[in-house]
Structures are given as C-alpha cells and as structure tokens.
Regions:
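A short, conserved, highly charged catalytic patch centered on acidic carboxylates
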Residues: 1-101, 109-111
Length: 112
C-alpha cells in the first residue's frame, strides 16, 4: 500500500470506529511493511487488538491496539475528541505495563 492509497482510502471512509479501527491499523502496518498484530503474535501475548485493562478510575476497558513495551492505541470515530481519547488511554496505561507511547486516532489524525 502506498501513502497515497492509504490516504485516499481512509479519507473517503465514513465507517464508525468499531467497524474500521482494526482495518485502519492493518492498513497502516501494510503501509509501513510491518506485520499486523495477528501475524506477529497469534496468541496476543505481546501484540494484540482489544487488550483488556483495568482503569485507574475503576472498571474495565480495552485498548484498541497494544504492543508490549511499545505503545497503546485508542481509536475514536472521525472528528471525535482526541483529548478525551487520550485521557481514556491514560486510565489503562498502568494495567498495560506503562507503554512508552500512547497513541490516539480518529482515522484522519494520529496523535502521539
């Protein structure tokens, strides 16, 4: 996948977060010529979609993508508040072993 193909595909997409986030991340992996989570770690021990985590505020949640010792990633729908998404991800960070990068995206923007 070329950068132009990636941009064109995701600029045109109107899918909701739930139906698009894993496809978006897999396309990003293809763009960067990196293995996606399922290919890299079929058991999900160190690289996974929907990694469960206890929130520091109580309750349970899921990071949309997590790679041990690398990052946690939270997706939101297009044009959603990424500051709120970052706050949500911060609540999972301890349970996710404090990854050095917290990333949020609405599939148009990526913030690290």
């Amino acid at each position: 996948m070329t950068p132009q193909e990636f941009i064109a595909k995701w600029r045109a997409s109107e899918l909701k977060e739930r139906s698009a986030s894993q496809s978006h991340f897999n396309d990003l992996c293809r763009l960067l010529n990196l293995p996606d989570p399922i290919t890299a770690d079929p058991k999900g021990d160190w690289f996974a979609f929907e990694k469960g985590a206890s929130k520091t505020s109580g309750g349970e949640g899921w990071a949309d993508v997590w790679r041990k010792d690398c990052f946690a990633w939270e997706y939101k729908g297009k044009r959603k508040d990424l500051t709120a998404a970052f706050s949500q991800l911060q609540q999972y960070a301890i349970a996710l072993e404090n990854p050095p990068l917290l990333i949020v995206s609405d599939m148009d923007r990526i913030r690290i």
